[in-house]
């Protein structure tokens, strides 16, 4: 795909989810409207994952593209219409008879994702070992959690140049090489197994999720398996607690066949969130989600949230920025050489700070300039001047003096306080 086509495709992405309500801001947000280059809503400044955007097909395309040209192609299918790879996520539907007084009804539970194993009982056990609020039951808090983690852990702009803002041809090429490298060296998908089954696993046997699930024994493993199992004690690589014989465990091929995790312990070592759909990246003995693996390899722009492939970028406030994206969070004016104030880890220009964020002086009731000295006590502030920081009774200047605060007032003495009470 040429660069012009990629830019056109990027523009179409701004139409997705338009007008969707914000789950965090509720009625305060007029509806989702994607900022031109930030990955946030222009109206409320929350991310797309905080909005009720229906993106199941888009997410399946994103994960499908991630698995393209990897050993995990068994987990994708290509659409006949345009050849786009789609993620074949495993959906599990459980039916439980519910006895009533006169008849028996059927209670159906649908999991929007489940481990791709043939043994449904094993998949069900896996789900039960996850925190209830993280079980991806359709229409539940857990399904919303999975949706949010798909967006957070596997950003489309970490693998697809067409989802990025104005990359140069050189940057596009570097990004494509970077993606190819992490697909071949770090990307993996966990597999759910019983610890006793790990005795058939070894360096000469490889498992591909969604592929052949035969129980072929590893080369050289000819001794009695029951005797071998009695000698083997498995513990979780994360929490170090022992594995129970009948409980499912997660195996990550890139980590080695000797390492297992409890389902609830298969988390990113940086954000400590469950690895969504058991998709992991392995580096230096640690599990990472896609986002934090990429962060360990490349600087990420704090403005657009994209990885930086340019040799020239700026660093400020312990964060990295594309030169063109070091801008005011409120008005988008470039801040190079300008005075700015950090508000919730976001840079804001001086005019926007005074207009939208500055504290108000209790004395003169005007906004306090960020470069001006002030006196603060609890949630109240004053200009540190002889005109503003005064006794609320006798107007004596209190700079450098002891004072008695009472809500938004200050007094120089008990007598003045009594006179105002």
Swiss-Prot record:
This is Testin. The N-terminal and the C-terminal halves of the protein can associate with each other, thereby hindering interactions with ZYX. Residues 92-199 form the PET domain. GO terms for molecular function: zinc ion binding. InterPro entries: LIM1_Testin, LIM2_Testin, LIM3_Testin, PET_domain, PET_testin, Pk/Esn/Tes, Znf_LIM. Scaffold protein that may play a role in cell adhesion, cell spreading and in the reorganization of the actin cytoskeleton. Plays a role in the regulation of cell proliferation. May act as a tumor suppressor. It comes from Muntiacus reevesi (Reeves' muntjac). Interacts via LIM domain 1 with ZYX. Interacts (via LIM domain 3) with ENAH and VASP. Interacts with ALKBH4, talin, actin, alpha-actinin, GRIP1 and PXN. Interacts (via LIM domain 2) with ACTL7A (via N-terminus). Heterodimer with ACTL7A; the heterodimer interacts with ENAH to form a heterotrimer. Keywords: Cell junction, Cytoplasm, LIM domain, Metal-binding, Repeat, Zinc. PANTHER family: LIM DOMAIN-CONTAINING PROTEIN, TESTIN. Residues 133-164, 193-213 are annotated as: Disordered.
